[in-house]
Amino acid sequence: MLSVGQWPNKPFAWLLLFLGCSGLLGAALYFQMVLNLEPCVKCVYQRMAVIGIGLSAIVGLFGSGLWLTRWAALIGWLYSSYQGLLIAYDHWDLQTSKNAFFAVCESAPNFPDWAPMHEWMPGLFAAPGLCGDIDWQWLGLGMPGWMTVIFAGLLLIGIIVTICHIISSFTKKDGLVLYHK
């Protein structure tokens, strides 16, 4: 019987999270390289949040048997999802504001001096696009709208998994049961 509370103990669950993040980054690069949609600063920050979730998944994948690495992975997942949600929602709000004058953002990503990612890997982290431009839509939502939905989903799943993991850690039950045979 597989329970949500036991997911952090299973490398396969972390692998699925990593593959999901890899798919999101692959889609971002497809939009950038193939469709020629230039990312803006907020897009790059959202990309970093996805990378943060992916790195947390790698920590969980290789350290799911150890409680410290498992909790570091869960916290990294929750933190990166939350930050990504804030940035994506702010970007979405900026694009849908009535006054286009305020639909601007920084001209270059604000990375730490010790890790200028946009200088080290400009193909991935440079931000020549404008935050207010809506160059792509699907089902009425632009890229920031979809990323808001994705980050909200990742955060919600992360919260549920973490709560179930806490409950299953303090009880003899397996946590929230997904199915019965």
From Swiss-Prot:
What Gene Ontology cellular-component terms does the record carry? plasma membrane
A Pfam short name: DsbB
Q: What is its main location?
A: membrane
| UniProt superkingdom | Bacteria
Compartments (UniProt record): Cell inner membrane
A Gene Ontology annotation in the biological process aspect, one of them, is: protein folding
Q: Which residues lie on this side of the membrane: Cytoplasmic?
A: 1-13, 65-71, 165-181
Q: Could you tell me which cysteines form disulfide bridges?
A: 40-43, 105-131
Topologically, how does it sit relative to the membrane? Multi-pass membrane protein
The UniProt keyword set, sorted, is: Cell inner membrane, Cell membrane, Chaperone, Disulfide bond, Electron transport, Membrane, Oxidoreductase, Redox-active center, Transmembrane, Transmembrane helix, Transport
User: What ranges does the Periplasmic topological domain annotation cover?
Assistant: 31-48, 90-145
Residue ranges crossing the lipid bilayer per the database entry: 14-30, 49-64, 72-89, 146-164
Q: Which NCBIfam families match?
A: PRK01749.1 (NF002485)
What is known about what this protein does?
Required for disulfide bond formation in some periplasmic proteins. Acts by oxidizing the DsbA protein.
Family in the record: Belongs to the DsbB family.
Which PANTHER family does the annotation name? DISULFIDE BOND FORMATION PROTEIN B
What is the recorded name of this protein? Answer: Disulfide bond formation protein B
Species assigned in the record: Idiomarina loihiensis (strain ATCC BAA-735 / DSM 15497 / L2-TR)
